[in-house]
Amino acid sequence: MSDDALNLDEDSKEVIDTMMNTIEKPCPTKKVKGRLNNHRVYLAGPIDHASDDGVGWREELTPYLEKMGLTILDPTNKPVSQCRYNEIGDEKEHIQKLVNLKRWDELREMAKEIVLVDLRMVEVADFLIAYVDKDIHICGTYDEIFESLRRRKPTLIVHKGGKAEMSMWLRGK
């Protein structure tokens, strides 16, 4: 995985390197891929205000996680047919048009469905990996992190800027 593509600081690189070294170790038996095999991971992180709609870091991390036998639950690539809306691509342009037209009721209905599906993915995930950048507004990411923690799921937070830049709320969770 390219550190430059994610623009990570040293603490974040260390966390990801440690995680990758741990999950990429070969399993001693051929029957079982590893502890993570057949588990589901939700990838939380900025979407609305991310320059690439939050797709880049997820696409970069996904092959490593799939190699470990994980099922990826990605809000930028929803694996469910029940959600009619997505927050990226053409749908993002449509959302912006509705904002410009001040069609708040329609936007609220769309947002409710997006939130419902994303939080349902957090609910069915076995653990969560969250990418947090203090310079990007991440309302949904915080909700997903706190939902994961309320459900007592393992929650890995990769914070751009490292521990020194992390919010006291995240430290307290």
Residue positions per predicted region:
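Conserved catalytic or regulatory cores that recognize and/or transform ribose-phosphate-containing ligands
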Residues: 2-173
